[in-house]
């Protein structure tokens, strides 16, 4: 990869691989109470069951789709124009915002006036930023606490349900055995929800708009949806909903360009990224972010202190509240949906990290720790937190309260510094909620398995059930190059215990900046972890996809096995390495066991034999054993035979 290859806005184009529909899938939309509430889902078509296995119809299944218009063949994709402003009419209809005459951040104005950035700027934005009218609060939490169900909340309820009821009805009407099939395919193991309201003994039959509103009002969930990012498709982060995942992208001083970061974003959402964080620290941070936001159907998060540090040439001690405030406004007016802010790094906690194995590993945390020590005073993020809340509620930017003192090794897990900061984050949450500002809490980090639940329990207690958003955690430190696996283990566990969103880790963690392939690997690993957590919690309908794939596997519907899986391309590639011919796609075996030792084929043979003999499967097995016993004696009762 070249260091910062030349990017020109005139040449910008979408990556063709990111816009092709997935195999046997099509984009469908479910309409809500008004015509412009059109909720996207991915419909996966299945083949009929072969006649020998019953011959029934297998209706399509529906899965959560984060890819936006990119996988819709009917959508015209032009990244120079950006995505349609899906939520614009809803925002305008509320009548509590105003269009500004122009940018109001000093840095934004400077970039707009700089001729050197002209060929890099996003050309398709033809509207000025919005802000709350004086005295107004435009957060989804504020509306929820007023008893208002917004279009965003209705959209989310439809999206979370994934047409589960319609799928069960389609099974019932699939043929004479429809009722039996519906019971089988809808079966799900009871979960253990650890107190989550929507699961366990009190599991909801479906997610309703009122339930969404209530969870937002309580602070147990957030809808990251800046009024200046109307292109975003509403989604929710909370432990009573599907576990979500975040993908990190962003350039550095030594690698990547604007074009590559836009490609990474479209690639991440294709494979299931629910949100994307732009962690750019290199050149053209402002322009890179604009391109990403205008083309993103998912919420975008940032760490504003990174850009603020660039404005003072990397010298943490030179940071000021005024520079940081201007950065917040700059990014809020672009449309950033949530800010990671390390306001819990207090002066008193910094000495507690002295005896750590790995010290302070968070970039934002180390920046603020250095500032606190240089000035020997509390951080300006902590001191000005109420003023930050005023900015957040003017644009509906959500807090992601950063864990600047998270452990960077399992040696440091659950130490006094980490837990002291967590307690402070709980206190800051209460302040934000006083302003009706949405909050989620960031968590570790590196934590061995036996300490993971303690992290979750303390967070729920101290932060009053505000959504938890964790980086893994990594459960061991011995696997550079495989940290997507070491962290995926911890992610599945903490997701089960109650974490609402998991921040992915790629194979490049601790080693380098991820490329597109690494992004996909991290996404798929974390989709697995999130889904495993949904199953363990007992999320309604979570097992539908597993049941459909298992049925396809038992019936040797190879194409359906590939297509229902999280990564159809890799599944097909692995199968075709040893059985590449088209005939192998309908064969009743795979290359692992071959045609004579396939356990599923043997089971099918037993069932056929039972049907022919008019006996039960148990009797058929017994009868078959008796036949084989006679055959064994007749051939000499030898365990081994010479060829």
UniProtKB/Swiss-Prot annotation:
Substrate binds at residues 248, 277, 306, 342, 362-364, 403-406, 442, 469. Zn(2+) binds at residues 446, 510. One of its GO terms (molecular function) is carbon-carbon lyase activity. Gene3D superfamilies: 6.10.250.620, Radical SAM ThiC family, central domain (3.20.20.540). Binds 1 [4Fe-4S] cluster per subunit. The cluster is coordinated with 3 cysteines and an exchangeable S-adenosyl-L-methionine. It catalyses: 5-amino-1-(5-phospho-beta-D-ribosyl)imidazole + S-adenosyl-L-methionine = 4-amino-2-methyl-5-(phosphooxymethyl)pyrimidine + CO + 5'-deoxyadenosine + formate + L-methionine + 3 H(+). GO terms for cellular component: cytosol. [4Fe-4S] cluster binds at residues 590, 593, 598. InterPro entries: ThiC, ThiC-associated_dom, ThiC/Bza_core_dom, ThiC/BzaA/B. One of its GO terms (biological process) is thiamine biosynthetic process. Pathway: Cofactor biosynthesis; thiamine diphosphate biosynthesis. Homodimer. Belongs to the ThiC family. Catalyzes the synthesis of the hydroxymethylpyrimidine phosphate (HMP-P) moiety of thiamine from aminoimidazole ribotide (AIR) in a radical S-adenosyl-L-methionine (SAM)-dependent reaction. This is Phosphomethylpyrimidine synthase. It comes from Burkholderia cenocepacia (strain HI2424). The gene is thiC.
